[in-house]
Regions:
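Conserved AdoMet/S-adenosylmethionine-binding subsite of the radical SAM
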Residues: 88-210
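C-terminal accessory region of radical SAM enzymes
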Residues: 152-197, 226-277
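Short, acidic, Ser/Thr-enriched surface-loop or helix-capping motifs
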Residues: 215-218
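Conserved alpha-helical substructure of the radical SAM core
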Residues: 2-131, 279-292
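A broadly conserved sequence feature marking short terminus-proximal activation segments
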Residues: 1-17, 226-241
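Processing junctions and N-termini across compartments
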Residues: 35, 39-42, 200, 263-266
Length: 292
């Protein structure tokens, strides 16, 4: 779903883009769900605000999340937040479970690529829909199977703060190469040292509140994928009747959406610049009406 969203932003003029983007919104249940299968990571990037822990999501909880989502038809899933998803001991079982529940579900994996050689053949056979390899500086050696993965279902994401421009050319043979700036993860890291803007200036509503909540490894549900410390936790999955559905249709999220429409953001959103990842999806008249 999010890759389609990116395509819309790149290809369509603004009014058409807004209409098309809003067609992705489902006020009954989110179209896309971020699931942190693991908090573990084998890198220590200086800019990363992740908590340094190696916990994994309980697989029974994972299945319960997928079961709930599957009641609402085809959905898309990112199986990561701040950990490396290929370090999740049950990552292949997780992928298989999603596809078994609904073959039209789509799966996105964002990986640092360090263990991709080990999983390349199984990922090709698993029906993963998209793999994003996100790197600050790309390695020079790959196995033939890894190259096949990247060519068939991969997207290479290069953070231009760290990758020399001369390296971009050699990635032109892949289906998609995305060059993007590092964002500040809810104001948790200082991106101004790379000459990037903070969240200052005219804001517009963040798409995450209408499209994609996040579930941390321990079941904590937070408003989006840019909350490394879980500071915007809204509930714990499966406890006291709390679910993705109850959050998505509840008063808390309705108030958050209204505050964004009124340009009155609070909490983690105040210093965040990730809303700039996509153009504004709403028309001015909707904001004046306090669209929810």
């Amino acid at each position: 779903m999010l890759t389609k969203f990116t395509d819309l932003a790149r290809k369509l003029p603004s009014p058409v883009y807004k209409v098309a983007a809003q067609a992705f919104i489902d006020l009954n249940f989110p179209r896309h769900i971020f699931i942190e299968t693991t908090a573990a990571c084998n890198l220590t990037c200086e800019y990363c605000p992740r908590e340094k822990r190696n916990d994994h999501m309980d697989f029974q909880m994972f299945k319960e999340i997928i079961n709930e989502c599957s009641q609402y038809g085809a959905r898309s899933f990112s199986l990561h937040l701040f950990g490396e998803p290929l370090l999740y001991p049950k990552i292949m079982e997780a992928i298989s479970y999603i596809k078994a529940k609904n073959k039209r579900h789509t799966i996105l994996l964002t990986t640092n690529g360090t263990v991709l050689n080990k999983f390349a053949r199984r990922l090709l056979e698993s029906r993963v829909d998209r793999i994003i390899w996100s790197w600050r500086r790309l390695p020079t050696e790959f196995s033939s199977e890894t190259m096949e993965v990247l060519k068939r279902i991969g997207m290479v994401r290069i953070l231009i703060e760290e990758t020399p421009k001369e390296e971009f050319e050699r990635w032109s043979k892949f289906p998609r190469v995305e060059v993007k700036h590092l964002h500040n993860y809810g104001g948790q890291i200082d991106t101004t040292k790379w000459g990037l803007e903070s969240s200052n200036g005219d804001r517009y509503p963040c798409y995450h509140l209408w499209l994609a909540p996040a579930i941390r490894w321990n079941g904590d549900v937070t408003i989006c994928c840019n909350d490394p410390k879980g500071s915007e936790r809204v509930g714990s999955y499966g406890k006291d009747g709390f679910s993705i559905g109850t959050y998505w249709t509840g008063n808390h999220l309705a108030r958050l959406r209204t505050s964004h429409m009124n340009n009155e953001v609070k909490g983690l959103c105040v210093g965040c610049n990730s809303y700039k990842a996509y153009p504004d999806i709403f028309f001015n008249f909707q904001k004046k009406d306090g669209h929810k």
